[in-house]
Regions:
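Sec-dependent signal peptide recognition
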Residues: 14-20
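Ser/Thr/Pro/Gly-biased, low-complexity, turn-/loop-rich segments
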Residues: 2-10, 21, 28-196
C-alpha cells in the first residue's frame, strides 16, 4: 500500500486527523500549565493576619505585657484595653496602635510599646512531596525551600513550578509559581505529578 499523504484523505478524514493531532498536543502542556502565573511578590514588611502570634511589651507595665494570637476577626485582646485591630498591620504599626489605645483609655500616660512576631501563620505543602503537611512559615521562603521543608520532591514530581493558593484582601486566588517565587504565610502549595 502506497501512502499518498493528506491529499488522499477525504475532507472529513483530514478534519478528524487535525482534530486528533490538536487533542494530542493539548495533553503536552503538563499539569497546572493552564493556571495563570501568580503575581510576583518580594519579601516586604510583613503584615499580620489571623493565626499570627505576637509578643506585646509595654515597658514598665507588666500587666499590659504578654503574648497574643491574632483572632479570626483580625484583632488581639489586650488586658484592660480590649480588642485592638492587628490584621493588615506591620509590627511597628501595631506598636503605634496599641500605644494609642493605652493613651485613649487613660491607662498609661506616655506608653512605650514594642511588638514582635513570635509565630507566623503556617504554610501547607501538598502533592508530590515526601512529607506533605502544614509547616511553619519563615520570612524569605520560596517554593523550593517550602518543598525542602516538606521532605523534597518525590520522583514523580513536576519540579519546575507549583500551584499556589493565596488569600489576598480576603479572596483566594490560585496561580502557577516558579521554584524561586516567594511564599507568603497561609499559602497552600501543591506540587503536581509528572505525566510520563
Amino acid at each position: 500500500m502506497k501512502f499518498t499523504g493528506l491529499a488522499g484523505l477525504a475532507p472529513e478524514g483530514r478534519l478528524r486527523l487535525v482534530g486528533l493531532i490538536l487533542l494530542a498536543l493539548t495533553g503536552c502542556g503538563g499539569p497546572g500549565r493552564a493556571l495563570p502565573v501568580l503575581p510576583s511578590t518580594r519579601p516586604a514588611a510583613y503584615t499580620l493576619g489571623p493565626g499570627d502570634q505576637v509578643r506585646i511589651i509595654t515597658f514598665g507595665e507588666e500587666t499590659l505585657t504578654g503574648e497574643f494570637r491574632v483572632n479570626d476577626s483580625g484583632s488581639i485582646a489586650l488586658p484592660l484595653v480590649g480588642a485592638v485591630r492587628a490584621a493588615g498591620l506591620t509590627s511597628s504599626e501595631l506598636e503605634t496602635s496599641v500605644a494609642l489605645a493605652l493613651r485613649r483609655g487613660n491607662l498609661v500616660r506616655d506608653p512605650s510599646v514594642a511588638a514582635e512576631i513570635i509565630a507566623y501563620r503556617p504554610i501547607y505543602v501538598l502533592g508530590e512531596v515526601n512529607k506533605p503537611g502544614q509547616y511553619p512559615y519563615q520570612p524569605g521562603m520560596t517554593v523550593v525551600t517550602a518543598v525542602a521543608v516538606g521532605g523534597g520532591f518525590t520522583y514523580r514530581a513536576v519540579e519546575d513550578y507549583a500551584a499556589v493558593v493565596r488569600t489576598v484582601d480576603g479572596s483566594a486566588i490560585e496561580g502557577r509559581a516558579s521554584r524561586q517565587s516567594y511564599v507568603q504565610p497561609g499559602d497552600v502549595i501543591t506540587i503536581f505529578e509528572r505525566r510520563f
